[in-house]
Amino acid sequence: MYICPHMALKLTTYYKGSDIPDLPGNNFFHSKELFLLYEATPSYTPIYIVATEEQKTLAKILVVIRKNTSLIPFSILNRCDVYGTGEYLDDTIDKETLFGEMLSHFTKEIFREASIIEFRNLNNSLFGYKHFRSNHYFPVN
């Protein structure tokens, strides 16, 4: 669990589907259901980060570590896939700042297990650019 010093924000990381409470939202790519599917699939390790403020869910993001099972030498690199930039459940919050907090949190969390973190299907390629750069991400076409 991480508590952001800038606001009364609490980031909770879930590693087991049985620990995840029922959460609001309708984005399948950041849902408990997809977490459970990945959890039941060999070679995949899902991690779910939920941002709350005073018991209210503000945002959630599902990241998935994919273990490389290839027998080719030097292909033992694990990679992390993230689809989009998460789901935001409160329109009054600064989504980009909240994304920056979640990005910093899970980058530290995941970098121990995955050598590559890739964001896919970004709706707006400039969303969170400042936070990507401050966490040492770089764009690739």
Sequence positions of predicted segments:
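N-acyltransferase acceptor-side catalytic subdomain
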Residues: 1-141
